[in-house]
């Protein structure tokens, strides 16, 4: 059994729900506690294989006399040794399926990628671009200029053979990429409103920055119909349906060899690629100021990571179809889900000394480093001023958001406290009026009432005393 499961399942009996420390948004988990070879640590096995491999290269393989080849091979070998160490020794994250080692691997890849970005950041612009030739000799060449936007007619009457040719031209490989991307982003964020806000805001960013990057120039129907409504919207819808299924699913796990039927074994293998448990994200941005700022920060980092995809291709001279661009997207898909879960746990944690998760920390560092590379490698493009009407729109939007923030978390609270104080005072005055009206002593009559009661008490006490004296005399 993996370390994450063993930590949660400690003290629970066979087939019992793991309720200890479970949040209200977290599903119940039933686990029989099976500990198989698949889940055990293999630190000695990995160390033995690594030692044998290095020994073979050192003792039995002749070293080539090619300096460039040896340099590349040495760098790759160093990275592989680090990955072997990290996969076996790094700390587990919040996810454990299909295997904790899978997520430890991507954590180590995050470290390698961040170090690579730092190296690129400390090079000159020319050296940094030419260094990529060591990765792929086809890189390091200025990108050819392309025509974006163009004819935006949905129905082109001048084209008799195919009047809808503009639509067919837009149906390329990026259409399924948009759908799959937003489906996976929805699984990361787990909130419909946040996904739609990010989707719409990115289209506004493309409108605003098309004077800097030509590939942001698209037709209006490409922005709002094909991207937001069809590709992004359909991906978000399918993602929300998947989240609904995951939140209702029963999480009951048995060891593979404890399942008697082959059908059950195959089903258990397939479910190995589903979550071990499920936590429903309740971001509640309007509940407090720190949650509101945190959600705004998450949206900004998401948008910044999206923009970095296009700006890095532009400043590092990478064609959009290059495999490095695809590998970066695959990387963010794998690390983004872990980072979002760690951020949510960080926001939900009630301890005074909270600690941001390791993967979330690395994703934030990577996003900022990518931005710094863009700023260093092409400051001229980034400093191209926004058109006046666009800057006015962003200024107005910023003022509206700031005004709502001040009203919601400052003025509204002051107003509510003032109204509550007035309500309490009115209730107090009404209580006094009622007490004075029905004959009961009010708050101002306490002292007077007490004195009268004492006088009456002393008078009543003297009457029996006089009667007792008279009877004794007789």
UniProtKB/Swiss-Prot annotation:
Report what the protein is called: Phosphatidylserine synthase 2
Q: Which GO terms describe its molecular function?
A: L-serine-phosphatidylethanolamine phosphatidyltransferase activity
| Enzyme Commission no | 2.7.8.29
Q: In which pathway does it act?
A: Phospholipid metabolism; phosphatidylserine biosynthesis
Q: What are the alphabetically sorted keywords of the record?
A: Endoplasmic reticulum, Glycoprotein, Lipid biosynthesis, Lipid metabolism, Membrane, Phospholipid biosynthesis, Phospholipid metabolism, Phosphoprotein, Transferase, Transmembrane, Transmembrane helix
GO annotation terms (biological process): phosphatidylserine biosynthetic process
Could you say which enzyme class this protein belongs to? Answer: transferase
The protein's location, in the record's own words, is:
Endoplasmic reticulum membrane; Membrane
Q: What is the lineage of its organism?
A: Eukaryota, Metazoa, Chordata, Craniata, Vertebrata
Record's compositionally biased regions (Basic and acidic residues)? 464-474
Q: Which family does it belong to?
A: Belongs to the phosphatidyl serine synthase family.
Q: Which gene encodes it?
A: PTDSS2
* TM region positions: 41-61, 75-95, 105-125, 292-312, 314-334, 355-375, 382-402
Residue ranges in the Lumenal topological domain are: 62-74, 126-291, 335-354, 403-474
Q: Which residues carry this modification: Phosphoserine?
A: 12, 14, 16
InterPro entries annotated for this entry?
PSS
Q: Which residues lie on this side of the membrane: Cytoplasmic?
A: 1-40, 96-104, 313, 376-381
Q: Which GO terms describe its cellular component?
A: endoplasmic reticulum membrane; membrane
- What is this protein's function per UniProt? Catalyzes a base-exchange reaction in which the polar head group of phosphatidylethanolamine (PE) or phosphatidylcholine (PC) is replaced by L-serine. Catalyzes the conversion of phosphatatidylethanolamine and does not act on phosphatidylcholine. Shows a substrate specificity for phosphatatidylethanolamine and does not act on phosphatidylcholine. Can utilize both phosphatidylethanolamine (PE) plasmalogen and diacyl PE as substrate and the latter is six times better utilized, indicating the importance of an ester linkage at the sn-1 position.
What's its membrane topology?
Multi-pass membrane protein
Q: How is its activity regulated?
A: Inhibited by excess phosphatidylserine, but not by phosphatidylcholine nor phosphatidylethanolamine.
Provide the reaction this enzyme catalyses: a 1,2-diacyl-sn-glycero-3-phosphoethanolamine + L-serine = a 1,2-diacyl-sn-glycero-3-phospho-L-serine + ethanolamine; 1-hexadecanoyl-2-(9Z-octadecenoyl)-sn-glycero-3-phosphoethanolamine + L-serine = 1-hexadecanoyl-2-(9Z-octadecenoyl)-sn-glycero-3-phospho-L-serine + ethanolamine; 1-hexadecanoyl-2-(4Z,7Z,10Z,13Z,16Z,19Z-docosahexaenoyl)-sn-glycero-3-phosphoethanolamine + L-serine = 1-hexadecanoyl-2-(4Z,7Z,10Z,13Z,16Z,19Z-docosahexaenoyl)-sn-glycero-3-phosphoserine + ethanolamine; 1-octadecanoyl-2-(5Z,8Z,11Z,14Z)-eicosatetraenoyl-sn-glycero-3-phosphoethanolamine + L-serine = 1-octadecanoyl-2-(5Z,8Z,11Z,14Z)-eicosatetraenoyl-sn-glycero-3-phosphoserine + ethanolamine
List the carbohydrate attachment sites: 159
Keyword Membrane: yes or no? yes
Region described as Disordered: spans on this chain: 1-25, 422-474
């Amino acid at each position: 059994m993996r370390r994450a499961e063993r930590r949660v399942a400690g003290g629970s009996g066979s087939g019992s729900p793991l309720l200890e420390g479970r949040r209200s948004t977290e599903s119940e988990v039933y686990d029989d506690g099976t500990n198989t070879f698949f889940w055990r640590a293999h630190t000695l096995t990995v160390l033995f294989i690594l030692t044998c491999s290095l020994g073979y290269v050192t003792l039995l393989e002749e070293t080539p006399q090619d300096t460039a080849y040896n340099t590349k091979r040495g760098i790759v070998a160093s990275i592989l040794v680090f990955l072997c160490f990290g996969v076996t020794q790094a700390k587990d994250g919040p996810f454990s399926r299909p295997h904790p080692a899978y997520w430890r691997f991507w954590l180590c890849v995050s470290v390698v990628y961040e170090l690579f970005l730092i190296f690129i950041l400390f090079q000159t612009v020319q050296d940094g671009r030419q260094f990529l030739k060591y990765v792929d000799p086809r890189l390091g060449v200025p990108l050819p200029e392309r025509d974006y936007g163009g004819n935006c007619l949905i129905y082109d009457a001048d084209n008799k053979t195919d009047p809808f040719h503009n639509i067919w031209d837009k149906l390329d490989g990026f259409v399924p990429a948009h759908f799959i991307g937003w489906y996976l982003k929805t699984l990361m964020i787990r909130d419909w409103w946040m996904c739609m806000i990010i989707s719409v805001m990115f289209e506004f960013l493309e409108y605003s920055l098309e004077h800097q990057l030509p590939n942001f120039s698209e037709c209006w129907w490409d922005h709002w119909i094909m991207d937001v409504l069809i590709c992004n919207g359909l991906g978000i819808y399918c993602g929300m349906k998947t989240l609904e299924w995951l939140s209702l699913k029963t999480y009951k796990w048995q060891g593979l060899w404890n399942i008697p039927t082959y059908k059950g074994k195959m089903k258990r293998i397939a479910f190995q690629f589903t979550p071990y448990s499920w936590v429903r994200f309740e971001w509640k941005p309007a509940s407090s100021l720190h949650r509101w700022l945190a959600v705004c920060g998450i949206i900004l980092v998401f948008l910044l990571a999206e923009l970095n995809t296009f700006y890095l291709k532009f400043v590092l001279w990478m064609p959009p179809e290059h495999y490095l661009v695809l590998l970066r997207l695959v990387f963010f898909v794998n690390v983004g889900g872990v980072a979002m879960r760690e951020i949510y746990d960080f926001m939900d944690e009630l301890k005074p000394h909270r600690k941001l998760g390791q993967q979330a920390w690395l994703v934030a560092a990577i996003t900022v480093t990518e931005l710094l590379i863009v700023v260093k490698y092409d400051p001229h493009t980034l400093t191209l001023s926004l058109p006046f009407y666009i800057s006015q729109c962003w200024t107005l939007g910023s003022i509206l958001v700031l005004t709502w923030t001040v009203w919601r978390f400052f003025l509204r609270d002051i107003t509510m406290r003032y109204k509550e104080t007035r309500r309490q005072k009115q209730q107090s005055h009404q209580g006094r009026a009622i007490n004075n009206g029905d004959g009961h002593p009010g708050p101002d009559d306490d002292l007077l009432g007490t004195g009268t009661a004492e006088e009456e008490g002393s008078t009543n006490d003297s009457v029996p005393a006089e009667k007792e004296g008279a009877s004794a005399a007789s």
